[in-house]
C-alpha cells in the first residue's frame, strides 16, 4: 500500500497524524503544518496559500502569505447561477468569515500583530530550532518581569524626584531667609541676591545631573543583569530544542537543520583567537544583499514581539553568519539615537519593544545581545576603553573617560567582534531640501549607510581602537597591555577598508623627530587600491586649532610623495610645540578627478609629532598646489609617463629639461614655477612648455640658486565644461634644488 508523504518533511504520513488532502492534494504531519515563514501552528480553517504562485504548495499564516497584500481578506468562494447565489455560496461565505475570525483570534493570543506591509521574502524555506509557541510564551514571561522592573524604576524615579524637590525647596528657603535678614541689616544688596539665585540654580542643576547619572547607571546595571538572565533562558530553550531534534530524527520539518545542529555549541565557548580571517567568510558585502534588504525593509516598519522580529529577520538566513548579519543591519538601520517616544507609551506596542532606549537602560550592544539570544546565537557584552570621539594620539586612558562597550558573537565556529554603534551611519541628504525639524521628516531623508568594518572585525584590526578589560577578549594570540594599546597608531575604519598598512610595524602614535627635525610616516597601499586612492593631510598644533607658525601655514612643512605601493609623509618640524598630523584619503575615479570638482577626504590616521629641541631654521616648501609631490599622480590619473625624472625631488643646475610621454590624448599643458619670497609673475619667463606628438617637454632656466616648486596642469583632449568653462586640472609637481654657478 502506497502511503502519502508529508510535503514539508517528505516522510510518510499516517492517518493518526495526517492533515489533508489540501486543495492541491498535498498532505502534512500535524507537527509540520506550520507557517512556512514564522513557524506558527496552523489549522485547516486558518492556513493560507500563495495566490500569486500556483507552483508554491507551501502553507502560510495570514500575516506572512506572500501576496501583493497579504492582509486582504480571503475571497469568498461564491458561485452564481442566473445571477443568484446558491445556498452553498452562502455557507462558503460564512465559512470564510469564520476563518478570518479564527486567524485574528489566534494571532492576538500569540502576540503576532506586526506592521504592514511585510517585505516579500523569497527563499527555500525558513528553519527554526525552537517552536514558535514555546518561544512566544517565554518572551511573554520575560515581558512581564521587565514590566515589573520598569514599574519599579518609575516609582523610584518619582520618589527620588519628590525628595530632591523637597530638599531643594528647603535649601532655597533657608538661603533666601538668611539673605533677607542680612538685607534688613544693610549688609546685603540686590546684586548679591541675583548672585545668590544664580549660585543656587547652578548647584541645583549640578545636583540633579549627578542624581540622574547615578540613577541611570543603577537602572542600566539592573536591566543588564535581567537581560543577561533572560538571554540565558532563551538560549537554554534552543539547547533543549536542538537536543530533542537530535534525539528524534523523525520530528518536525528540520531534518537538514538537525544534521548541522551539533556544530553549534550548547554553551558559550571560552574566548579564543579566530582560526580564520574575515576574508575567509566573505570578501564582498553583495553576498548579504538579500539579507540586508530584508533588514532594511523590516526596520522601516514596527513589530510587537522580539520573536516575530527575529524570525522575520532570519527567515532567509542559511548560516549563523547570516543571522548575525540580519540583526546587525536591522540595528544599524534603526536610528535609535533619534527615536521619539510618547509619554503614554504602551508596553505591548511596537515602540514599547524598544522602551529601554527611552529609559536610557538599553543601547546598541545590549539590544544586539538580546536579539542574538532570540536567534539562538551566543553573544557577550565586552567593556573596556576605546579611541572614540575626543581622543587624540598620545592620550592616556584614565578613570572613566573613553569607556566603551561592544559585542562578540559566536559564528562560523569562532568569536567575532561586532560594534553596532560605530557601524551605524545615518546621514541626512542635504540635496532633499532644508534641514527638517520633525523626527519623521528627518527619518524620511535618511540615507541608510553603514560601516561594514565593524561587523565581524578581525581582532588584529579591532585592537587598534578597542581595549577590553579582560585580556582574553582581545582574541589575540599575544594580548597587549594598556600602555601598548596607547602607543598603537591612531587609525580609523577607512584605514583597513582601503587596505592600508604601516610599512614600519613598530610605528607608534607619538613620533619623535630625528636630530635634523624630520619625522617620517610611510603607509603601504594594496595594489588593488593604489590606482584610485588619493591622499591629503592637515598639520596643526596639538593643543589648539592653530595651523600657522610665524605667519606660515604648517602644511608647507610637510612633503607628501609616493614610492612604489606606498605614500610617504615627511614632516620638517619648525617648532618645539607638539603637532598633530591628520592623514586623509578617498577613493576617486579618474573621471571624477578630471572634472576638477572638490573631493571630500576622510580621516584614516593621526599622529602626534614631537620635537624636543630645534636649534635649526626650517625653510618652508614653495607655495605649490596641495597634494603629493612627484610624477606618480600624473601617471596614475592622466596616463602621463615620466621619461626623465621619476622622483619628486630634482637636483639640477641652472638649466633643466623634464620630459613626459602621453599614453592618452591630453591638451594645453601649463607649468608654473614658484619660489619663496619671489613673485610668481617674475618666474613665468623661466618656464617653456612644448608638445611634440606624444612627447611633453618642459624646459626650465632657473635665475638663481635655491629651492623651487614646479606645478604642472593639463586637461583631456575632449574638453569637459564646468559651468561653461574648460578647467585645467593639477597633474603633478616637483621640488627642484638648483645650483647656479
Regions found by a protein language model. Give the residues of each.
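N-terminal interaction/assembly modules
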Residues: 1-47, 52, 293, 311-313, ...
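Hydrophobic/aromatic-rich core segments of domains that either
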Residues: 364-456
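Beta-strand-enriched, solvent-exposed domains that form extended recognition/catalytic surfaces
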Residues: 505-741
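Catalytic cores of secreted or luminal carbohydrate-active enzymes
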Residues: 437-503
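Core residues of folded domains in eukaryotic genome-function proteins
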Residues: 2-5, 9, 15-17, 24, ...
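Secondary-structure boundary elements
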Residues: 265-360, 366-375
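Intrinsically disordered, low-complexity segments in eukaryotic adaptor/regulatory proteins
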Residues: 1-253, 258-260
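Solvent-exposed, acidic/flexible segments
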Residues: 131, 135, 139-143, 147, ...
